[in-house]
C-alpha cells in the first residue's frame, strides 16, 4: 500500500504552486503540522537568518517500517500504533574527520542540524521517487493499456514527457544517496558526479507547459476526465495528476537549496567542504539552465500567440526577431490610446491593443534603436527612436520606476548586443554589470542576459518581465574605492553574480580572466560613479562606429571602444588594451581627480555640455605625466593586478543608486575632465576616428577606413553628426535618403597636418580641432554662432597672450562664455564658476542672445566686410592669427568629392604680416593664412590611397616647435566642453531661424522703401508659433526645416579691390577647410557658406547693377529633386556624398556626371592628378536657401562638347582671374574677359557666374538683395510668397536659346587672352593634361558677378516646369509637408 500524502514528510523549503494546491489539501497535506525546533532539542543557535528550516515532520511520526511497501499490513499497523521510529546509528564526521555516532554528537546542535538536513534530503528523495513511480506505473502504463481512451501517442508523449527517464535516473540517485551513510560530503559528491545527467530535467521542464495544455484539454474530454478522476480515487491520491506532473520541476529547482543548508551548517574546516560548494554550483547551474530553457519555451509560445493576434504587420514572422524579452502596456506621448510594446531580441514592436488583437503601429530594430533614458520633469518616461529619425520619438511613460528601470535595462542590453560594431563580450558585460550595480534587482550573468532577481526560488517574475533566472541569495557589499585592485579583484572573483556579493561564483565565473575582473573593479570603484545611462549624452559615448559589414577592423581597436582608455603601461597584464596603437575615448565617465595639480587649460571652459565624450587631445607627454601621478597617488598592487584609477575613498553602496537617473552633475564633469586627462594615447597611436557625441540624442556611427599598419591620420567619415558640431563620424550605410537627421554634412576626421609639435601630431584627436579653431576665429559664422561661444569678453584681456606653442590649442578652447581664466585656477573652480550656466534652461540661453541685433541676420546674409564691427579685429591678435595659420592646415583630406563650407577666420584679418606659412612659394604680398591649406595640398601629389595621402601630410607637419609638450596640451579640455560650445552654436542657429524679425531698424533711410521686409517661411511660421512648444522642439523642427525649404537664390557678392588689406583678408575667409581636399569638384566649390552662400562675394553697388542689368537676381527655376537630405547651417561638415556625387558648384553649374572631366581638370589646375570616379547626380539639397545651382545632371543638357568646353573655359578663366588678383603685377589683365564672359549662359537658365571686380555693397544693399528673393508687397503681407504662372516664362525660353550660340563662340578665345596676359596657367586647354600652374596654391577667386545684360528681369520669374522638373506647386506642397512633418511638438 502506498503512503498517503499526509504521511510523507514535506520540506518547508519545497515550493508549492497553484497546480499542486488545487484540491482541498495543500502540498503539506491536510494533517500536517509544523514542529518547532525546540521540540527537537534545538535552540536559538541554529535559528540563523536566511536558513531554511527543515523541521517539518508528519503529525504522527512514522516508523521506518512504513517504508517497507512489501508489507502493507505491518506498515498500516505501525502507523496506527503511532510508534516512534527508533534512531538509527547515524555516522557523522566531526571537524577532525573522525566518525562519531549521533549519540556522541548529541551535545553538538550544529552537527545535529546538519544531520537533520541530510535526513531531509534522503526522505524527500524517497518520497519523490515514489511519486515518480506512481506517475509512470499508475498513470502512464495504465493509459497505454487502455486502448479505448481517446488519447493518441503524441498527446500521451506531450502529457508525460520524459518522465520515465527521470524516474530511472532518480532511482539510481536515491540508491547512491542511501549508500552515503548520512555523510553530507558524500551526498554532495553524488550530485557532482551525476551533474551531467541532470540535463534530462531540461527536456522535461521545457515540455511542462505543453503538458499542462494537453492535460487541460484532456479534462475537457468527458471520457478522459472520468478516467483521471477514477485513477486518483483508486490510488487514494489527495492530489490530481497535474500536481504530480509538477513535482519534477519543483524537485530539480530545490536541490541546490538543500545543499545550501548543508553548507550553511557544516564546519568550514570539515574535509570535503569544497565538494559541497561544487555541488551547490553544479545544481545552481542546472537550475539556471532549466529556468532559462523553460522561460524561452514559454516566450516562444507567447510569441506565437502574439503573431496570431497581430494585425497590419507586413514584416516577416516575429520568430525571426528572436526571443520575446518583455511586453508591457504604456501611455505614449501624443497618443490618445495606450500602446502595447513587445521587445524582442532584435526588434521593438509598438502596437495598439484593440479587443483581443494587436494592431501594428511602429517598429524599430534593436540595431538601430536609440534610447533616451532621462526626460526632464518626467521621471517615469523614456524615449525610443530610430537613430536615423530622431524627430520621431516614442516617449513612453512607465507605470512605476521599477517598470521603467526594467525596460531601460533590457533596452540597453539589446542595443549593445545588436550593435553593428564588434563589441567584445567582456566590454558588454562590464557595461551591463556597471548598470547592475545601480539596480539591485538586476544582474548580468555570464550566460548572457540581464537577470531579474525577485527573490523567488524559481526565478519567478512579474508577468511582463520575460524572466531570466538567477540565484536569489545575493547580497551587496560596500566597496571602497581606496581598496587595492587586488582586493577588488578578489571581491570580483568571489561573486556568483555581477553584483557585489559574498556568495561563491560558479566555476566558470571563478575562472574568469583578470581582464574581466580588473575592468569590473575599475568600473565599480568610483565613488562618484553614476549610471552610465543617466542621460543620452553619456550613452552616446558608449557606442562606437557602425561599420559596414565588409570592413575588417582590428579586434584590439574594437576593444578599445568600450574599455576605459588607460595607458597600456597601467594594464600591461590585464590587457584591457590589446594593442597600444589605438586609444578610444572612454566609454563611461569617471577618472582620478588629481588633487595635487591639474593639467587642464587655464581658461574657464564651461560650456553647455550637449553630449558626453572625451577628447583625447593631450599629447603623450601629458598623458604620461598624469599616469605618473596616478601611479604615485594610487595604492600599489603586486603581480599582475591593475592599478586602481581612483584616488578617493568614497564608498559605493546600494544607497547610491537612488539618484542614478538624475542629470549629469558637477562631479561627473570633473570625472570627465580627469578621465580625458588620463586617457591619452601613446605616441604611436594613430588619430583614428573616435566616438562622436551628439547634441541630439543619437549615435555617431563612424566608418573608419584607416588601419593600424598605415598609422594613418586620415579618416574618411560622412553622415549623421551632431547639430552644430564641427566634427562628424558616420558610415556609408548612412547614405540613405533618410539620413538627414539634423545635419548630414559630414566632416572628415582631422589629420594632424597643421600641428607644429611632433608630440601633438602623434596625439590622438577625437574632435575636429582644426575646424574648431576656425570656429573660434570666424566672423562669417557670427550670425549663427553663439556670441558666448566665439567672442572674447571685452571686459577682459583683448588678446589671448599665448605663446606660439600653445596658441593653437588655446584657440580651440577659448572660453565660450567669453571669459579667460588664469592658468593657475584649478579645474574645480573653473567648473564650479559656471556649472549652473551649463545646465541652464535653453530658453534663458536663447533670450540672452536675442538682444544682439546682428543675431537676427540669417546665417548666410550677405554683408560686406565694411559692415563688420570693428571689435572683431581688435580681438584678433598676431599670435592668434599666427596660430590660426598653423591650424588651418590641420584639416583632413576626404577621399570622395565633398563640399566643405568655408570658415572666415576673423583672426586672419588682424595681420597678414604675422601669418606663418608652410611654403616659401607664397609671396609676401599674397601671404594669407588660408593659403596654407592650398599650398599644403598642391605640394602633395594626389595619391590614390587616401591613407598614403594622410601619411604624406603627416610627414609635412612642421617640427619647428617640437617642444609644445605639456604646456600646449594644458590648453586642451574635455570634448564634453567642445560639444557644449557646438551645441550652443546649434541653438544659436535655431535662434536665427526662429527669431528672424524685420530688419528695418538696421536699414538707413535710403532703404525705407524696403520696409516690408520678407522673411523665409521658417521665420514666418515661427512668428505664428511664438509661445508654442519648448525651444528644444522648435530647434528640432526648424534646424532641418530651414534647409528643406528651397527659396529663390540670394544675390552674389562682389569684392572690391582692397580685399587684400590686413583688415580685409577675404581670401582667408573664402577658403574652405577642405581646400586640400582631393575629391571635391573644384577650388571654387568650397567658397561657400555653410548654407551654400558664396562666402565672400558681395554685389556691386546697386546703382551700378541697375545701370547694367534690370535685375541681378539669379534664377534657379528648378527646385532640387529631393529635399530629404537637407543640410543645416552651422554643422560645417562635408555632406556624406552619394557615390561620386556631383557637388554643387558655387561658381559654375553642377559638374557633369557623365565623365569625370571636370574634376580631372580641376585637379590639373592644382597640379594634381584627378581621381577617376564616376560622378553621380547629387540630389541633396545643400542648404537650399542659397544654393546657386543644384540641378541634377539630367536637367543640364550639354548639347555638344562646346558646352563642356565652355565650362572648362570658365573654370580656367575664373582661376586665371583669381591669380591675377593675387599677384598685383597682373591685376588688371583680366578686365577684358570679364565683360565677355559675363554673357555666357548655359541651357535651362543655368547662369555661369564669372569674375568681376566691383566694390562691395554695404549692409543695406545686401539686405535689399537678399530680400529681393521675395516679391515685395506694399502692405503687411509678409507671409505672402507669389507663385508665378507658367505663361510668364514662355518668352524667356526663346531669348535664352538665342543667346546660347553666341555665348559659346568667344569664350575660349577670351579665356586664352586671360591666360596669356596673366602668365599664371600653362596650356590648360586639354582638361586631362596635369599641368601644375605656377601659382596653383593661390588659385582662389572670391569675386563673382551675376550674369550679363541679356538676363533681364524676366529671369527672376518662375519658369514653367520642364518635363524633368517638378511642378512648382508640387514643390511648394513638398515644402509645407516637410514643414508639418518635422514638427516635434
From Swiss-Prot:
Give start and end of each PH domain. 317-416
From the UniProt record, give one GO term of the biological process aspect. Answer: regulation of small GTPase mediated signal transduction
Residues folding into a coiled coil are: none
Q: Which CDD domains does this UniProt record tie to the protein?
A: PH_PLEKHG1_G2_G3 (cd13243), RhoGEF (cd00160)
Compositionally biased intervals (Basic and acidic residues): 868-885
Q: Where is this region: Disordered?
A: 1-31, 63-101, 455-518, 570-646, 677-696, 701-732, 868-887, 1318-1343
- Residue ranges occupied by any DH domain in the UniProt entry: 113-293
A Pfam family per the record: RhoGEF
GO MF, one example: guanyl-nucleotide exchange factor activity
Phosphoserine PTM positions read: 1192
Q: Which InterPro entries match?
A: DBL_dom_sf (IPR035899), DH_dom (IPR000219), PH-like_dom_sf (IPR011993), PH_domain (IPR001849), PH_PLEKHG1_G2_G3 (IPR043324), SOS1_NGEF_PH (IPR055251)
Q: What is this protein called?
A: Pleckstrin homology domain-containing family G member 1
